[in-house]
């Protein structure tokens, strides 16, 4: 049967396509918007059956043009948290997602979709409960509102609906994202260009570089998606993070040491990297004060309760792999 991936040329979508290929799945319809044409590179080493622009996909899917569809991985969205055009954001992320959901429900196809930890906004608790959800931007609101639709639909749904609140994802195939790419990507490029990595200094009681995030490898994101693909009886909204907050210092230090290893140089401690000027702390910008999350950490209770028991890569493991991959692309 056919599998459809929206946002297939994007960061997470392309990694899901590749992961499906590695399992022998090639009857894949890739859906995307290639106005940013450079995204095509993410699919060059992937096998797909067909490609459709997002503007024609929903109508054709609703009409039944693709025969029996097993599942839709709905990864397509505007993920720019700085986007201020609310009308565009709601049409692209909310209305379009509702149309894809309706078509999946009508045809009995599994619906696995990208939600976001941005739904939690400034919360200090990250559990899939309405009372801790308070998005701070229209991107987060578009994801939040769609999750509310899912909560209403789930009790009567006859086919799988699984949403994943992605935390800070990093890894291969994100180059096209530019300023919205991960901190690991930017640290890598900054170190190659300047010989050092710059991080924010002290802020809100956190020591320099010690602000933390739940950084999750796209490898693990793809694995979780495929676990639910294999278990169509499991539905719900799930946090998708490691459950382990790590500081930005860990990202920067791993980037530096991996690049040193590739140059046959010994690893250095964080203190040594700072002392040698390989990591530099800059004053926290006034523009971000009061708008910056110093801590995120996924509560994995629901995900583990659904049966996903595989370990997640640490920053040290995942960023090391990613830097080696990036170095091979240069």
From Swiss-Prot:
Function recorded in the entry: Catalyzes the interconversion between ADP-D-glycero-beta-D-manno-heptose and ADP-L-glycero-beta-D-manno-heptose via an epimerization at carbon 6 of the heptose.
CDD domains: ADP_GME_SDR_e (cd05248)
Any one Gene Ontology molecular-function term assigned to this protein's record: NADP binding
Keywords: Carbohydrate metabolism, Isomerase, NADP
Binding site for NADP(+): 11-12, 32-33, 39, 54, 75-79, 92, 143, 169, 177
Oligomeric and partner information: Homopentamer.
Catalytic activity: ADP-D-glycero-beta-D-manno-heptose = ADP-L-glycero-beta-D-manno-heptose
Cofactor descriptive note: Binds 1 NADP(+) per subunit.
HAMAP family attached to this UniProt entry: Heptose_epimerase (MF_01601)
E.C. code: 5.1.3.20
Superkingdom of the organism of origin: Bacteria
Catalytic residues identified in the record: 139 (proton acceptor), 177 (proton acceptor)
Alphabetized InterPro entries for the sequence: Epimerase_deHydtase (IPR001509), Heptose_epim (IPR011912), NAD(P)-bd_dom_sf (IPR036291)
Pathways involved: Nucleotide-sugar biosynthesis; ADP-L-glycero-beta-D-manno-heptose biosynthesis; ADP-L-glycero-beta-D-manno-heptose from D-glycero-beta-D-manno-heptose 7-phosphate: step 4/4
Protein name: ADP-L-glycero-D-manno-heptose-6-epimerase
Positions of substrate binding: 168, 179, 186, 200-203, 213, 292
Coiled coil stretches, renumbered: none
UniProt free text on domains: Contains a large N-terminal NADP-binding domain, and a smaller C-terminal substrate-binding domain.
Record carries keyword Transferase: no
Family, as annotated: Belongs to the NAD(P)-dependent epimerase/dehydratase family. HldD subfamily.
Gene of this entry: hldD
């Amino acid at each position: 049967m056919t599998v459809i991936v929206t946002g297939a040329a994007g960061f997470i979508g392309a990694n899901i396509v590749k992961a499906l290929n590695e399992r022998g799945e090639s009857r894949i319809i890739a859906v995307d918007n290639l106005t940013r044409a450079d995204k095509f590179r993410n699919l060059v080493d992937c096998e797909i059956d067909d490609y459709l622009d997002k503007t024609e996909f929903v109508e054709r899917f609703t009409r039944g043009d693709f025969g029996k569809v097993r599942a839709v991985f709905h990864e397509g969205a505007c993920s720019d948290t700085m986007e201020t055009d609310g009308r565009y954001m709601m049409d692209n992320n909310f209305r379009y997602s509702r149309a894809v959901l309706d078509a999946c429900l009508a045809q009995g196809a599994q619906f696995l979709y990208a939600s976001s930890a941005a739904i939690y906004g400034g919360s200090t608790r990250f559990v899939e409960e309405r009372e801790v959800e308070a998005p701070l931007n229209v991107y987060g609101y578009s994801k939040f509102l769609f999750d509310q639709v899912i909560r209403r639909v789930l009790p009567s749904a006859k086919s799988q609906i699984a949403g994943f609140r992605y935390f800070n994802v990093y890894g291969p195939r994100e180059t096209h994202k530019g300023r919205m790419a991960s901190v690991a990507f930017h640290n890598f490029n900054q170190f190659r260009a300047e010989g050092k990595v710059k991080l924010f200094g002290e802020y809100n009681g956190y020591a320099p570089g010690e602000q933390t995030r739940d950084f999750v490898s796209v490898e693990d994101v793809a694995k979780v998606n495929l676990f639910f693909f294999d278990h169509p009886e499991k539905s719900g909204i799930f946090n998708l993070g490691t459950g382990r907050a790590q500081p930005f210092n860990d990202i920067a230090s791993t980037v530096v040491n991996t690049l040193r290893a590739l140059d046959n140089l010994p690893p250095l401690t964080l203190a040594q990297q700072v002392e040698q000027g390989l990591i530099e702390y800059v004053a926290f910008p006034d523009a971000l004060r009061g708008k910056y999350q110093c801590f995120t950490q996924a509560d994995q209770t629901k995900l583990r309760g659904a049966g996903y028991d595989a370990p997640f890569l640490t920053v040290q493991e995942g960023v090391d792999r990613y830097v080696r991959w990036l170095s091979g692309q240069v």
